[in-house]
């Protein structure tokens, strides 16, 4: 509102002017700029590396994580390591993992890592905040090789001792890369045609694993009692229906291929029994 008043006085004109507007404040505040809140970026797990991609139970594997963080020194981050089996030794970004005897094998195990960053929040709420990230390592192939090799040997010989099990089924755990697979199939076919096993006993004696971890040797004390069902012409020592027993050591070899153990060959070392010399092979040694 503006008010003007003219005061006459000998040719002098005075003007009184008051300026303003209804309801306005002479000093209105400007817009308020909120404080800038710093953004804390989460840690980044760049890699998790194991000292071995294949391991035996009750041996240590070193697991190392490479982690970076823009705000917090990596040594101040919290690292939590987990696996479906085994224990961890150490702390921080590098630990040792050991799987116990009795863990299921052969199997693939992945190591899981949780990294936690705790920091002070620079906002109106204040207090501590957390960034949590998870990562998983490439799998580690775990074995209990002596047990696996012993199980393969006993399973094969147990199938051989059961005359109702086909030759093809008996050799399912033999490697295609070993000539022993074809030889063993022919031997079992011969046995099935000429004998019926009526009793057996098997006892695992020894298992050794090669220094390179790629070969194995097994010895099983074996005893088979069988009845002759067919004789070849000219075999004067053979009598259909005769029952006899062969006993000695069944010696087997194995190879490691395609991330597992396979049988490679099987041979019998024992005394020959008249009429049963061809029990294990059509070409007895």
Predicted features and spans:
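Short, low-complexity N-terminal intrinsically disordered segments enriched in polar/charged residues
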Residues: 135-162, 172
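Bacterial Sec-dependent N-terminal signal peptides
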Residues: 16-47, 52, 137
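Proline-centered linker/hinge motifs at extracellular inter-domain junctions
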Residues: 43-44, 149, 261
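Exposed beta-sheet edge and beta->alpha loop/turn motif
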Residues: 213-285
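Surface-exposed, flexible coil segments in extracellular/virion-facing regions
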Residues: 82-98
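Extracellular acidic, Ser/Thr/Pro-rich low-complexity tracts
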Residues: 67-72, 117
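Solvent-exposed loop segments of extracellular immunoglobulin-like
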Residues: 73-80
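Short solvent-exposed beta->alpha transition segments
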Residues: 167-222
């Amino acid at each position: 509102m503006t008010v003007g008043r003219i005061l006459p006085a000998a040719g002098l004109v005075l003007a009184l002017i008051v300026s303003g507007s209804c309801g306005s404040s002479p000093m209105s505040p400007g817009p308020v700029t909120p404080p800038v809140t710093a953004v804390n970026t989460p840690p980044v797990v760049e890699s998790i590396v194991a000292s071995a991609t294949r391991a035996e139970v009750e041996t240590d594997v070193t697991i190392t994580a490479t982690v970076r963080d823009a705000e917090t020194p990596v040594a101040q981050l919290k690292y939590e390591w987990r696996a479906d089996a085994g224990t961890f030794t150490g702390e921080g970004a590098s630990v040792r993992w050991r799987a116990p005897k009795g863990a299921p094998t052969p199997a693939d195990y992945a190591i899981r890592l949780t990294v936690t960053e705790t920091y002070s929040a620079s906002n109106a709420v204040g207090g501590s905040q957390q960034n949590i990230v998870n990562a998983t390592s490439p799998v580690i192939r775990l074995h209990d090789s002596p047990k696996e090799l012993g199980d393969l040997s006993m399973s094969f010989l147990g199938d051989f001792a059961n005359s109702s099990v086909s030759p093809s089924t008996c050799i399912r755990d033999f490697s295609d890369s070993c000539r022993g697979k074809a030889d063993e199939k022919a031997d079992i076919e011969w046995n099935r045609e000429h004998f019926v096993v009526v009793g057996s006993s098997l006892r695992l004696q020894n298992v050794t694993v090669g220094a390179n971890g790629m070969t194995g040797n097994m010895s099983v004390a074996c005893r088979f009692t069988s009845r002759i069902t067919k004789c070849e012409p000219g075999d004067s020592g053979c009598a259909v229906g005769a029952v006899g027993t062969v006993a000695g050591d069944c010696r087997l070899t194995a190879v490691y291929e395609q991330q597992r153990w396979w049988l490679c060959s099987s041979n019998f070392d024992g005394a020959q029994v008249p009429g049963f010399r061809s029990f294990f092979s059509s070409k007895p040694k």
